[in-house]
Amino acid sequence: MTIEYRQITIAERRRFSSAVEQGFGKHYTPTHDAFCLDNKLLSPDMTMCAFDDGEIVGTTGAYQFESAVPGGAIIKNAGITAVTVSATHRRRNILTNMMQRLLKQERDKGQVIASLWASESIIYGRFGYGVAIQHEAIKVDTTRAELKHMPAIPGRVRYVDIHEARQIFPAAWDAAVRYHVGIPKRSDDQWDRSMIESSSQSDWGQPWFVVYEEDGEPLGYAIYYLKELGIFAGQSSGLINADMVIYSNPASHAALWNHLL
């Protein structure tokens, strides 16, 4: 068996996406708009894949990001994504060969750092990655929860629809990029794809959007979903899925979580 390593071609773009989703146990069934955005966001020259007799058996890619580092400088950041190896080709050194080629490819483009959101973090230390932040899923009983400290809130939280969210959330995101280390800047196409994803979580229904503003300036926002479980003993019961909480100062952080709780 000879494995070929190379970038995909434009004609192989849908096969690439199907292979990526298959690697995560899903089927690739995008809308036309989502497929067009996928093509623009991750073009063939941003990929590095493994082929066995023409079949895609391994995938990697790298978004072209910019992120803040300690000290406030904004630097180029290769956002590693779509890392999969087919279950039929495991333990054949395919991931190592793809990752080495992809990192060299991105270094040659002038990318200063590489970052990723690891589904299996134990894998990536061998390639030079280190843990930058922990990810936790937290369940909160809102009937018993309150903020321990509530700073002064000079602004306000208000609801917006998806169209206004698309217009004003980027400003809040940019403020958060300057406030936090590591958050990548987003292009218009990335924002369009993000809003499509936010509106397509069918298990939770339609999203709710709120923005935190001070003097009309967006400084934070939240995207969340509600699921009503029923009425028990005269009281309604339900779940809130806080999908995204973006903030750029203590006031926006507290105000948004106070709203959610």
Annotate each PLM feature:
Residues 1-14, 18, 26-28, 52, ...:
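Intrinsically disordered, low-complexity, positively biased terminal segments
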Residues 3-9, 13-19, 23-27, 34, ...:
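Ligand-binding pocket scaffold of soluble enzyme catalytic domains
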Residues 39-41, 71-72, 130:
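Short glycine-biased active-site loop of nucleotidyltransferases that positions the nucleotide triphosphate
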